[in-house]
């Protein structure tokens, strides 16, 4: 894979007295990734079940990320020399009975920076301003071994679908779904006070009626437990060091009427 390089609108410069060096430059390098994937697909239980398993590995060179410079308000894109990601994905579906279908999707990911590289955490550097660039620079950290940004360690989507035909000739479909998203770090800094995005799990349910006259009526319940899960977060790298939080939608109850023609 390939992502082109580019130029930053804001970037740093080295101090004339040598007290600090630029960490965000006028240009940034292209990002490349070497990927490998091995998979297997298998049907069994007389064709009523199927499993797909994939194992993958990604090696990144010059991974692009949002970086902070010792000079205030000079954030931009920088490159991490080497990083890697590996994992496994499992898909499974089975017709348990004539009326019940079971579906499961699981994902496991491990990621890390695999080379020495120093970054500056804007959350820590924000306490210092113009004239204190050397103090900001002294806060830089080596992120070798840190998790890559926004790569959940575990994801799961499991559902059970029940379908039947009623005595009236209309059909009924019920779906019960469980979704889990594991925790991740929202920046490569891995600052536990702002970067850790915790896991969450939700339950969804729906009941649908398909009538013989091409009308359909669905009752839908999303996030049944009203879980206040955190979907993601983002910390500004350009100066104010503010962190914005994005939550998953609250409990939603919906009715949908549709007509096929």
Question: Language-model segments: what does each one mean?
Answer:
Residues 1-37, 47-51, 55-80, 117-119, ...:
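Surface-exposed extracellular loop regions of Gram-negative outer-membrane beta-barrel proteins
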Residues 21-27, 74-79, 85-87, 141-147, ...:
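Extracellular loop and loop/strand-boundary signature of outer-membrane beta-barrel proteins
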Residues 29-31, 41, 54-56, 81, ...:
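Surface-exposed loop and edge beta-strand positions of immunoglobulin-like domains
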Residues 32-36, 84-86, 150-156, 199-203, ...:
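Residues that define the transmembrane beta-barrel architecture of outer-membrane proteins
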Residues 39-43, 91-94, 105, 161-163, ...:
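Transmembrane beta-barrel domains of outer membrane proteins
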Residues 46-51, 99-102, 167-172, 213-217, ...:
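Repeated loop/turn-to-beta-strand initiation elements of outer-membrane beta-barrel proteins
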Residues 57-59, 78-188, 260:
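Gram-negative outer-membrane beta-barrel transporters
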Residues 179-189, 209-261:
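C-terminal beta-signal and adjacent terminal beta-strands/loops
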């Amino acid at each position: 894979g390939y992502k082109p390089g580019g130029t930053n609108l804001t970037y740093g410069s080295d101090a004339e007295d040598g007290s600090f060096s630029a960490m965000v430059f006028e240009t940034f390098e292209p990002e490349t990734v070497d990927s490998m994937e091995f998979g297997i697909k298998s049907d069994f239980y007389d064709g009523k079940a199927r499993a797909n398993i994939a194992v993958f590995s990604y090696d990144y060179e010059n991974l692009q990320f949002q970086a902070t410079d010792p000079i205030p308000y000079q954030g931009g894109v920088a490159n991490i020399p080497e990083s890697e990601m590996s994992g496994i994905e499992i898909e499974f579906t089975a017709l348990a009975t004539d009326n019940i279908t079971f579906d499961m999707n699981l994902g496991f990911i491990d990621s890390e920076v695999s080379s020495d590289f120093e970054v500056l955490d804007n959350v820590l550097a924000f306490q210092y301003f113009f004239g204190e660039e050397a103090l900001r620079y002294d806060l830089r950290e080596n992120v070798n071994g840190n998790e890559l940004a926004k790569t959940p360690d575990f994801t799961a989507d499991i559902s059970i679908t029940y379908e039947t035909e009623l005595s009236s000739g209309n059909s009924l479909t019920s779906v019960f779904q469980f979704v889990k998203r594991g925790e991740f770090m929202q920046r490569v800094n891995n600052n536990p006070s702002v970067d850790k995005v915790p896991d969450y799990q939700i339950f969804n349910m729906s009941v649908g009626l398909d009538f013989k006259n091409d009308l359909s009526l669905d009752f839908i319940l999303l996030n049944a437990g009203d879980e206040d899960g955190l979907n993601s977060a983002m910390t500004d790298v350009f100066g104010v060091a503010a962190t914005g939080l994005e939550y998953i939608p609250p409990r939603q109850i919906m009715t949908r009427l549709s007509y096929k023609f």
